[in-house]
């Protein structure tokens, strides 16, 4: 990988907080499990998003349609070699200090996170792009096997790059998310949302860049009712090319989550640092360390968690 062009990374990772508190009944246990599933999906999606960092080559890449889940953007100089189709995959092994994301510490565990999917971002006209994305995520826990689950995302939308404002990108997209048990024969959660957002890249040199962004996820429909939320998030990402093959990433996200059918209100933070060793433009080895904090007006759903792990990633563009 070379540094012939500046590159910018925005980390779209957010840690969603989860669902309203209730007495300790079987139904409440279901709420707790669903809450943690949704939060883990977005937390690990944000962390592993740093893994999709191989240099895509010359050409402008708008905010990737996979970005809402994978957390990457590439911004280079436009030319005719822009590749609109991306295939991506990641397999990572993590240790988490609080697997169930419970108040008071919780139990640690190892888990495997697997992600694979495809994104198509065709240029429609000028600086207007379309996008269609499919993403499958699988989470498998070593000891707490009852926490294992699958996540499927399907969505699409439009992206517009305002060159006159320093390549400020604005976008709108629809997303459908479905969580199931590991055998995919029972639904845990689903939600349909519209995401509106913008992001502004800053290039300091060929080796250093940053991005600021804002996302608003607006609920259209979802189930179970207690798990449905809107989300408003501020994001900041930084990338440094340490060598020709080694890159460092930092990101921070602050999210406000008002739940639709309950009085629950959460403030969520995630801070993550990662390293990527790019073996080739298509394949990389990654490691990360992250801390997440959730502050809720329902004390039961306040928690903190530390995650560390490593994995391998592939990103192919056509």
What are these regions (language model features)?
Residues 91-99, 122, 134-140, 174-180, ...:
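Transmembrane beta-strands of outer-membrane beta-barrel pores
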Residues 80, 121-127, 161-165, 203-207, ...:
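Outer-membrane beta-barrel channels and translocator barrels
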Residues 85-89, 128-132, 168-172, 194, ...:
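Transmembrane beta-strands of outer-membrane beta-barrel proteins
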Residues 2-3, 24-86:
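N-terminal periplasmic/intermembrane-space "pro-region" immediately following the signal or transit peptide
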Residues 74-75, 115-119, 155-159, 195-199, ...:
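Outer-membrane beta-barrel architecture
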Residues 108-114, 148-154, 188-194, 226-232, ...:
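Residues that define the transmembrane beta-barrel architecture of outer-membrane proteins
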Residues 277-278, 284, 288, 304-318:
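Outer-membrane beta-barrel "beta-signal"
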Residues 82, 92-119, 142-144:
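Surface-exposed strand-loop-strand hairpins of Gram-negative outer-membrane beta-barrel proteins
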């Amino acid at each position: 990988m070379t540094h012939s062009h500046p590159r910018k990374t925005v980390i779209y990772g957010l840690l969603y907080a989860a669902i309203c508190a209730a007495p300790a009944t079987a139904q409440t246990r279901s709420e707790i499990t669903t809450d943690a599933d949704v939060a883990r999906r977005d937390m690990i999606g944000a962390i592993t998003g740093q893994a999709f960092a191989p240099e895509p080559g010359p050409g402008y890449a708008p905010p990737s349609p996979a970005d809402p889940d994978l957390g990457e953007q590439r911004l280079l100089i436009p030319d005719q070699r822009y590749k609109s189709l991306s295939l991506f995959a990641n397999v990572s092994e993590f240790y988490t200090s609080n697997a169930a994301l419970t108040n008071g510490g919780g139990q640690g565990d190892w888990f495997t996170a697997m992600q694979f999917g495809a994104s198509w971002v065709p240029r429609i006209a000028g600086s207007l792009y379309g996008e269609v994305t499919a993403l499958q995520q699988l989470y498998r826990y070593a000891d707490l096997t009852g926490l294992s689950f699958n996540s499927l995302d399907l969505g699409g939308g439009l992206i517009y790059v305002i060159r006159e404002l320093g390549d400020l990108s604005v976008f709108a997209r629809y997303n459908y998310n479905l969580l199931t048990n590991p055998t995919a024969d029972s639904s845990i959660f689903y939600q349909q949302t519209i995401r509106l957002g913008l992001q502004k890249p800053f290039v300091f040199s060929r080796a250093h860049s940053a991005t600021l962004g804002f996302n608003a996820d607006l609920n259209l429909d979802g189930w179970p009712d207690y798990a449905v939320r809107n989300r408003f998030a501020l994001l900041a990402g930084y990338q440094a090319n340490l060598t020709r093959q080694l890159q460092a990433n930092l990101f921070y996200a602050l999210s406000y989550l008002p739940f639709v059918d309950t009085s629950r209100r959460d403030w969520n933070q995630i801070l993550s640092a990662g390293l990527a060793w790019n073996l080739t433009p298509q394949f990389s080895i990654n490691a990360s360390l992250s801390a997440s904090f959730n502050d809720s007006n329902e004390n039961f759903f306040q928690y903190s968690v530390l995650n560390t792990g490593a994995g391998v990633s592939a990103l192919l563009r056509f």
